[in-house]
């Protein structure tokens, strides 16, 4: 339906099966399921993520778990329990923790970055442990949402 060239779009903040079905009609294959450990709207419990992960795979969609603000051992446990194939972690973990996630799960790992936590040296260090970077124009802080444009 749409031709995005080499850009892979991801629709984030999915909270129900009906949204998955609509997304599938628009030829977008990547969907973001946001853990309630993160700040912001449209977050899901681990049980809800597990249910939507199964529904996503049934619809031939690629769900991505967005997670952070918890210890890496708990991230590993959730990734394995949910049986998700890709996880996007917040940019708070050290390279050793990312290596642990890489070694203890079968999931591809991506990392969320934004204009406030852009550290080129860190990105060079973790490059062998992740599959992609996601650049976020919205920063969720406990009770605040800060938005930027690409121009900014």
Each predicted region: which residue ranges?
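Short helix-capping segments at alpha-helix termini
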Residues: 4, 57-60, 105
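N-terminal amphipathic alpha-helix/helix-capping segment at the start of soluble metabolic enzymes
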Residues: 1-12
């Amino acid at each position: 339906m749409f031709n995005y060239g080499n850009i892979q779009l991801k629709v984030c903040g999915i909270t129900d099966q009906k949204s998955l079905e609509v997304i599938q009609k628009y030829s977008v294959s990547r969907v973001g399921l946001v853990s309630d450990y993160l700040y912001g709207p449209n977050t899901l419990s681990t049980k809800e993520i597990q249910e939507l992960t199964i529904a996503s795979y049934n619809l031939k969609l690629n769900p991505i778990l967005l997670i952070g603000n918890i210890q890496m051992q708990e991230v590993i446990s959730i990734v394995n329990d949910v049986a998700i194939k890709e996880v996007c972690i917040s940019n708070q973990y050290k390279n050793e923790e990312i290596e642990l996630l890489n070694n203890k799960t079968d999931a591809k790992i991506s990392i969320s970055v934004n204009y406030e936590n852009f550290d080129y040296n860190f990105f060079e260090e973790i490059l062998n442990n992740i599959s992609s970077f996601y650049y976020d124009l919205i920063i969720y802080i406990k009770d605040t949402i800060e938005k930027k444009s690409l121009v900014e």
